[in-house]
């Protein structure tokens, strides 16, 4: 018994190692003692097939690694380009500021400066609108949550009141001192109609 379980564990370990080293390789069956080479082909063919599978897996992995590296390179390149553009823009603005202070702006520089100013003003106005919209959104969320919570409170109170009403007895309390429950006093009948007479 122990030798069979040990053999099964060893076979499983070998299969795990083979799957790590040669992905897609055929697993070893621990139940069969003889190899069935006739149905699968010769050992050389099996080795060749396993190597081809391993090469395909490596190529696929290499392709995905290349794609990932290309994506990272593109991200870095975009970040560098943005940083360079920002530095260039700042240098241009410094030159324009210096020319404006010296009153030596050309028509082209004045036009560019006006465009930059208009763009900055537009951006600032759009930020103000966003702040207003954000404030309105916050107010509407607060209104909705307060309405929702008050509605939930009303429903809870209504359910409690309904429960309390259903708990109350339908008829009044007809207790008389000295009598056991369910017995009427002497001279009165159990019927309610006789009370009206």
From Swiss-Prot:
Keywords: Nucleus, Transcription, Transcription regulation
Keyword Heme belongs to the record: no
GO cellular component: nucleolus
Pfam families: RRT14 (PF17075)
Compositional bias segments (type: Basic residues): 65-78
Span list, region Disordered: 25-84, 142-197
Signal sequence range: none
Polar residues biased stretches: 34-48
Cell compartment(s), UniProt: Nucleus, Nucleolus
Major place of residence: nucleus
Transcription regulation among keywords: yes
Residue ranges with Basic and acidic residues bias: 159-176
Domain of life: Eukaryota
Family: Belongs to the RRT14 family.
Biological role stated in the UniProt entry: Involved in ribosome biogenesis, probably through modulation of rDNA transcription.
Protein name, per record: Regulator of rDNA transcription 14
Organism the protein comes from: Lachancea thermotolerans (strain ATCC 56472 / CBS 6340 / NRRL Y-8284) (Yeast)
